[in-house]
Amino acid sequence: MTAPSSTPPTLPIWVRAADTLTVLLGLLTFQAWLFGGVRFWFISVSDPWRPLFALLAITTLRHYLLRSPPLHQCVGSWLRATWPGDALAATWPTVIFTRLSVLLVGYLAVVSIGLPEGAPPFRLSDNEAINLPLRWDTGWYLNIAMEGYQWNAETEGQQNIAFFPGYPLVTEGLANLLGAQHVMRPPLDRPPRVAMEQFQQIFLGSALLVSLLSFTGGMLWFYRLAREYMNDSASRSALLLMSSYPFAIFFSAAYTESLMFLAVIGAFYHLKHERWVSASIWALLAGVTRPNGFLLAGPLAVIAFQHIRKKRPTSATPEKVVLNSLGICFATVMPLFGLLLFSGFIYSLTGNPLEWLEAHTAWGRSFTGASTLMLPIDSLSERGLIQYTSAQPVEALNALSALLACSLIWPVMRRLGPEYGLFMALNV
């Protein structure tokens, strides 16, 4: 007996559109029933009945015109093709164990060791488990998600325009789906302070959920990409290394690292498999998630060149060649377009498209190029190893990580390809 195919059946475009709309209406129905509806731009759902009636009408018409394959079979085929069983089996134990371990250790550290003396960090609750994700720059991302970007020309201190919008936008969308829009809507059924705390806690929980889900999705694509270069055992080892190296702590934080990881892996994987639309979406997300996201255009250009060179002797029609080339180029420039979009927005807000870059000086950060790598070397030669690492432990750790990454560029390039080596070189 042959196993069922995991490849989604080829269907007319109207059937795929109807099935997609049906699934979305089903999700909206469930959301409205559980969380009271949602409002996005021109879409407003306040009760589950309207999307439910629309779902039933579209499903009935679709199956009347095309009974086979039914909707549930198409959805199952798509899920099996997108997230194969081997990828799930390899990924979920590593993801769950490492992410929960980081959160558990963090919580135990807070309740057993305590917080530093002085003013406690910003808190949303008396429960330290709820406050745990609220560290470092998380408050800035939540501020953008809840209140949007704000800029004051007379303020010389820190302002939220220094942070890119991808992560706050996704967080805001998820928080609204989880009912945040209804918490502060009058008339309030609880004291304003309690309502505001609940509102903020929904956003904080949504931010952490975005990070954890993004990391999970990124690890699934990471495993599939790794399997194209190595066997299953080595791919599983790569998953473990990715999720447990020292800086992987940020994959369990309400930070941009997880979303950026997902966007980069998604862009790499889909461009390599010639899925131009999906690759473009992931590449654009990378461009609006972190300041270095636009650098992804370099490695994507290498992949695009490889595709074009590989398909030069082809029997395809000129029209198909042109469309294929346009798709490749479009996906390649999306990270740059994301940077331009954010810079254009900042220009409309401040009159300077690079004001977001200048805002980093309030944190004492500035771009100094390769000289950043030379400063630790100079300090090391002057002070000696023990004195330098004792005086600057964080800088020493960062310098060691940078040197290790630089030493791996050539082996990675030789083993996996120039696109990966270039990605490392651009992001050290």
Where are these regions (language model features)?
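Start-transfer (signal-anchor) and selected internal transmembrane alpha helices
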Residues: 1-23, 55-121, 323-334
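Membrane-interface helix-loop-helix junctions at transmembrane boundaries of multi-pass membrane enzymes
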Residues: 9, 311-330, 407-425
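Short hydrophobic/aromatic helix or loop-helix immediately within or flanking a transmembrane segment
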Residues: 132-150, 154-199, 372-378
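Multi-pass, polyprenyl lipid-linked donor-dependent membrane glycosyltransferases
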Residues: 210-214, 223, 229-271, 286-298
